[in-house]
Amino acid sequence: MASLPSYQDAVSPDWLPLVAPYVSPKDYPALCGVNRRYWDVFAPRIWSRIPRSDTVTGLDDAEYDLDWLLNSVFNGVSRMRSETLSLVRVFDARSIRGTYSLSMGVNLNTKLKNAVKFLPNLNCVLIDGHEDLDPSESFAEVGHQIQLLSMAGCPVSLSIKFINTLRGIVYLDLSYASGSLRPLFQDDVLPELRVLKIQGKEVDDTTVENLTARFGTRLWSLDLINNKLTDQALDSIGAHCLWPANLRSDTNFDVEGKLEFGCTTPDFGTWTRIVESEWSASFSHPNRHFVDAPLYDLHDTLPQECVSKRLDGKFPVKSDAADAVCRGLQGEDPYFPPASFQASQGLTHLNVSGNRVSSLGVMKLLTLCRGRLEQFSCDSMMLVPPLKGTMAAVWWPKAAKLYGFYATHTLRPVLSSNLRVVKLHHSVVTQIPTLELEGFSSMACLHIAENILLPRAEMAFPEPFVPDMNPRITSLTLTHIPRRSSGPLINRLVSFLKLLSAQERALFDLSSRRGPSVLAGLRHFRLEFEQDAYEGDAYIAGEIDAEELLNSGDKGFSFFDDEAGGRPRPVRELATSPPQKRDLTEFSVSQGEQDLETEHLDIDVWVDGKSTTVKVWVGSASNESSNPMLRDYRELALHCKVHDRIGPASPAQIRAGVPSSALVFHTAWCMAIMPCRHKSATIKEPTRVELDAMKDVLSELKQFRLEGRAKYLKLQGQSANGTCPPGPPHGFWLGKLEVSTHQGTLRSKTADYWR
């Protein structure tokens, strides 16, 4: 048995590994020749990944091609020392051009196959976008040792035989690759799979049902971007992939509130109501920014790692990106050991952007996820499921689509206990929905959404997301943000940045004195903008560079400067569809109910496996003259019989006027954001003058940041020690703010871009 190290050896780490990260990679080859100790430190940095980055090889990315890789690197594999070959763990061909010379003679995949069999420890393969590489052929003999395979965009499919050899694979990315997913449905296939990415694979609800039933809680990350999923798929994910143990508790009742559970219905799930404490509804408890204290077992019967408890919020979220998982499997992650990437306690990372889900489906999933999700992405969702074939469709404006997410209470830690990284439609913060109306321009839709729908959305859901609603969230991405605004959108985003600055100051004050550990707060805020909606000269809009616009100190560019003096457009009204003849009898019967002074409807629902009658709140008849949103909700419930998604009132709905203990029709409530049949609420197209007044959101945000930074630097210069605390009075947020625009290609702006 080896002797234990001395105390001095144990507390005095070798200095060489400590300084290695700061050494220039171009010096690695020379340092390997110093002695064996240096070789042990620097040789893995050269050979762990093939091809190595240009910082080691001295080659530019443009010089990488498959000819170079196979002829200069793999040709000499058979003559290299086995000790050196054993260092190779990653084959990353993503930066290499996907073409090769016909003069190579030997088939590309055959040559690669002959080379990789000399690499006993190769376990990560990344070949995204390559047309010439077929993993089923190239890596047939080493499939059993592969733990990560990323082949997004490859026009080849994996053979069933090869998939059966991937017994130890942890990460698999088949996004936009050719071939069916049917091989994944075999019994006892991919037993160690933990991360599955299948973007753009035409996946439907049935496929997700089969997939989730097959893998269950084995997956901790599932990426389903750009498929054909509806709310039914979210139900399948919630039923099969989430670990059964509940992370929610009443321990933090004073700070966060607590949950009260009721019956279970098929379309809404378990009725879950938030019971507020004296502080929780205002998100103002003095202890809201502290990390969780350690949880001790009263009887000391379980090891601490086996106790089911939420994360304390102190450490970052484990990433499911290919590079991050690759580093983690090699033991290079500073926070998570390789075992954490290979183990699973159910789904924690879910991405369903680019699908056909609704906000109600997302609300149900987040409500019933037992606090397990740590990272959730859904860039756009319909406000309600499709209305075709229902009486409600008669009252919804013809050919209208509404997108948004208002269930902000589901992001609170009392429900989403572990949620740290979020990507959602911008309405979660701005309360402004995305509107699509047939016959109306994009600019007109933006104006209508801000000036007609926003006031109604504020009536329905008077509780937008704010940073202290969940200070455990560290990263927030808002999507589908319009480039043009008549004012409300700009004001909402600016107000949110001010709240971020205020949170930053509160955390700074707490961390500057002795006390419990403090949460990081929201440190990464990303804004994803849509393409500019200007339609008068589309070719001009396509040439506008957002970076140049934001970096300039000039007034924001106006697309309408040449037309400001033009005559207003004739006003058009969007009429609602007249009732069809077959519906008149039903409407007249419902009108009789509406004339009653009832505030509740008796509805038969299927609860816990049996039919039960419940009372659902429909509003008071006295609200018809004072609150148009409540008036339309009542009409949708009584007149149109929109009686689905029955559930407890959310905190926002209670603030809007719903009794705290009431049940509501959630679909009807969301639909009431859109004006119904009332003549006074007819949607009119804005005039050219009104559209001319809309400002560029990017330009206004840039101006706000420049003014805040100027104040910050001035206060910093006036300080005796040259420092300035965050927050008021300058209000300049010091976190990482990113912007992306969809103009030609997606361009991302770094944090320095805003400073």
Residue ranges of each PLM-predicted region?
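Acidic, serine/threonine- and proline-enriched intrinsically disordered linkers and terminal tails
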Residues: 236-343, 380-399, 429, 435-455
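A structural signal for leucine-rich repeat
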Residues: 113-117, 137-145, 160-169, 183-192, ...
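Extended HEAT/HEAT-like alpha-solenoid repeat tracts in very large eukaryotic scaffold/adaptor proteins
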Residues: 87, 339-354, 411-418, 465-478, ...
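Conserved hydrophobic beta-strand positions in leucine-rich repeat
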Residues: 91, 125, 147-151, 170-174, ...
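Extended, low-complexity alpha-biased scaffolding regions
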Residues: 41, 49, 53, 57-77, ...
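N-terminal adaptor-interaction module of cullin-RING ubiquitin ligase components
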Residues: 1-107, 133-141, 159-163, 184-185, ...
